[in-house]
Amino acid sequence: MRGARPDEFNFSTNPSTPNTGQPTPTYPAGVGGGGGGRKKGVGVRTWLVLNSSGQSEPKEEGKHSIMRRTGLPARDLRILDPLLSYPSTVLGRERAIVINLEHIKAIITAQEVLLLNSKDPSVSPFIDELQRRILCHHHATKPQEEQNSGGEPHTRVDPAQGEAGTEQSSGDQGSEAKKDAKQSLENQDGSKVLPFEFVALEACLEAASSSLEHEALRLELEAHPALDKLTSKISTLNLERVRQIKSRLVAITGRVQKVRDELEHLLDDDEDMAEMYLTEKLAQKLEDSSNSSMNESDTFEVDLPQGDEDDRLPPEFASEANRDGRYLQANDAHELLMSTQSALSRNSRGTHTSSTRSAMTNKLDVEELEMLLEAYFVQIDGILNKLSTLREYVDDTEDYINIMLDDKQNHLLQMGVMLTTATLVMSAFIAVAGVFGMNITIELFTDNKHGPSRFIWTVIGGSIGSICLYVGAIGWCKYKRLLE
């Protein structure tokens, strides 16, 4: 047999020792290799954890720890990364809901809420409001939980009822977890209480919509005076203010539009809304686990030996079995087969009933979530309509300013035409003076008696002729509607 090469079993952790063909072992921060002076691991951030009773606790968790805790993939956690620019997103997963709305970056599970940027000053009011809502939800569901868990008598089986009573008690215990989960969602007065994840989701949606609405209102209050001032006086300062307002308007309109599109996408897809029922899915898992344990117990009862089967018989049948043991042995195979068939049929009926009830409940729950999302969809749509109205007002102001500038430009062009016409007439008069200024001998220059008077009449006649030419040119332009 060929021997192994020396470097195949080289597992040395010394960095100076080469280890070809094997991956270099890596150590976390502070473990080995002088890691005591290194920073904490990459991806470790401070999360504020709010449990179902309203208590908050900051924890430093890494990416992999959050993935194990919430069951989310790495790409979903990347959405919450503050260093990356992701649009507003609401994702429903198997065990958690990912919320990335404006300044709110959170992960909602069936029992807790994890906030990423809890130290942000803009998030502090949201944390207080979320704690208040969670406390109200906890106080609303706590009496029912105490009533369901405390002082409830256990179901006793009458020995005279035999196996039927045992099967009935097992079936009741199979759906006990789901009944408790359903009863915990009802208030003392019988009114419906939203699940924990919907309470947190509603708080996130309300905080995001309120933030957008306040920003839109503040922008509207700043925009109207600036636009009115620009209308009355066009200046560089007013134009700069309107330009900044328009840039902010475009930015906030895009953000509101993204939130609206996200809510509309959720409302159009019932499967995505069904994924957000974390409490329902958790109760369903508990029911499935109880059903599986019940199935195992039924299978175990079917496979019991002959002595145990005799012990499980009711009293009136036990006496008959003692009197006629041979009859019981002859029908042992038949009874075993019938008990197996009854167990299988009972399990199939329970599974069918559970699935039917779950489907009907999911339909009602999706309708309930749809009503919740529609309320905030209408609010976001109203904010978008306000921004659209403000955008139209800005566009109308721009059109009005352009009309004013065009009117001023037309006046400047008319003035240019009038000045050009006057210059042309003056050029004609100067041409007459130039003709008389030529150095030639004529009779007018040699007449000493009538020379000055003729000069005066020539100047007066040239001026009157120039004025007549100017008036005629302006009249022709107005006739052709070149001038107003």
Swiss-Prot record:
Tissue spec: Expressed in the whole plant.
GO molecular function: magnesium ion transmembrane transporter activity
Coiled-coil residues: 203-275
Region of interest (Disordered), ranges: 1-40, 141-186, 286-320
Membrane topology term: Multi-pass membrane protein
Alphabetically ordered keywords of this record: Coiled coil, Ion transport, Magnesium, Membrane, Transmembrane, Transmembrane helix, Transport
Keyword NAD: no
Biased composition (Polar residues): 10-24
Family, per entry: Belongs to the CorA metal ion transporter (MIT) (TC 1.A.35.5) family.
Protein name: Magnesium transporter MRS2-3
